[in-house]
Amino acid sequence: MPRKKVLVVDDSAFMRKMIGDMINSDDELEIVGKAGNGQEALEKIRELQPDVVVMDIEMPVLDGLSTLSRIMESQALPVIIFSSLSQKGTEQTLKALQLGAVDFIAKPSGQISLDVLSVKEELIKKLKVAANTSRKLPVYQSLHEPVVKAKKSLPDQDRKLNKLVVIAASTGGPKALHQVIPRFPAGIDAAILVVQHMPPGFTRSLAERLDSLSELRVKEAEHGEKVLPACVYIAPGDYHLKAKSRLKGTENELYIELDQSKPRGGLRPAADIMLKSVAKQFWSHIVCVIMTGMGNDGAAALPCIKEKKGRIIAEHQSTCVVYGMPKAAVETGLVDKIVPLSEITEEVLSML
C-alpha cells in the first residue's frame, strides 16, 4: 500500500523540520512538501495533491483559518490543525473545527524540541485517521460569525429533573455539537451531559461558544453542582464526569462528580464512565447519543443504558467525520435509531 502523502504548513522552519522528521519516521506516511504560509500551502496543494495537511493557525501572508476556508471550498481536503494552548489559540481551534478541520493537536509548551517529540504518537495516529476520511466532508460554517443568541435567564434551581440526554463524541465532535446543541428549544424538561474528547482548556472554550449560540445554558461541568433541566454540561478535559443522585425530602436530585481516576482506554473523560454512572444513578428517562469519533468509547456502557429502558441514537455513517464510535455502538445491536447529524436533535426530542 502506498504511503499517505502529507503536506506540512508552518511559518517556523524548525517546526517544519521537527514535524517532517516525525512523520517520515512512520512507514505509512511521507512528507511530499512543506509550506511557510497559507498562500504557499494553497499552491503546494494544487501542485502536490497531498492526502492530508497538517497546519499551524497563526501564519503570515494568509493565516490558517483563511487558508482552511479556501481548502474546504475547493476540495475538502482533510486537515489537522496545530493549536496553541492560549485562550486565543483554543478559540481559533474551535473555529477551525467548525470550518472543516478533521482534528487538532495542542502545541506543547516549554522546551520545544523535547515537547514536540512528546506529541509524535498522537500526530501520527490522527494523520492516519484523517488521511482515510472522506474528502467530501460536510462544511457547516463559514468564517462569518454565527448569530449569537440573547442572554439567558438563570436556571430554576428548584425545577424537577425527570429526563436526561447523554451525548458522546470524539473526532469531528465539536463541529457536530454546533449542529445539535443550538437546535434544542429553550425550556426543555431534560438536562444534557456531554463527553467530548478534548484536552483541558478546549472544553471550556467549546462550552462558552455553544452557550453563545444556544437557547439552552451551556457550561463546562463543575464538581458538586446540581444538574438542572434546560442546561448542558460538558465534561472538562482530563476529568471523568459522573452522576450522583441524592435524596432531598421525597425527591431525587442529580449532581455532577468530577474525578481524575484512571483513564479508560487512554481517555479521560470517557463516555463509558459517564454512561455507566448515569445508568446507575439516574432514576428516570435517558436518551443516549453516540456521535462521530474514532475508537469505540461508549459502546461498552450501552447495555447499562438499555437495562434502564433508555433509548439510544447513533449518528449515520454518511455524516460522521470518523465512523468509529457510532459503528461500535451499532454493532452492539442495542441502537434504536441511526440518523444523520441534521436529524439528531429532532430525534432526541421525539424520544423525550
Curated annotation (Swiss-Prot):
One short Pfam family name for this protein? Response_reg
Which positions carry the signal peptide feature in this UniProt record? none
**Catalytic activity annotated for this protein?**
[protein]-L-glutamate 5-O-methyl ester + H2O = L-glutamyl-[protein] + methanol + H(+); L-glutaminyl-[protein] + H2O = L-glutamyl-[protein] + NH4(+)
Give Gene Ontology CC terms.
Answer: cytoplasm
One GO term of the biological process aspect: chemotaxis
Spell out the subcellular localization from the entry.
Cytoplasm
Give the main localization category: cytoplasm
EC number in record? 3.1.1.61, 3.5.1.44
The chain residues annotated with the modification 4-aspartylphosphate are: D56
**Which SUPFAM superfamilies has this protein been placed in?**
CheY-like, Methylesterase CheB, C-terminal domain
Q: Where is the active site?
A: S170, H197, D297
Q: How is it modified after translation?
A: Phosphorylated by CheA. Phosphorylation of the N-terminal regulatory domain activates the methylesterase activity.
The chain positions of domain CheB-type methylesterase read 155-352
> Where is the Response regulatory domain positioned along the sequence?
5-122
Domain of life of the source:
Bacteria
Check the record and name the Gene3D superfamilies matching this protein.
3.40.50.2300, Methylesterase CheB, C-terminal domain
Q: Which family does it belong to?
A: Belongs to the CheB family.
Q: What is known of its domains?
A: Contains a C-terminal catalytic domain, and an N-terminal region which modulates catalytic activity.
Role this protein plays: Involved in chemotaxis. Part of a chemotaxis signal transduction system that modulates chemotaxis in response to various stimuli. Catalyzes the demethylation of specific methylglutamate residues introduced into the chemoreceptors (methyl-accepting chemotaxis proteins or MCP) by CheR. Also mediates the irreversible deamidation of specific glutamine residues to glutamic acid.
Q: What is this protein called?
A: Protein-glutamate methylesterase/protein-glutamine glutaminase 1
Which organism encodes this protein?
Answer: Syntrophomonas wolfei subsp. wolfei (strain DSM 2245B / Goettingen)
Designated gene of the protein: cheB1
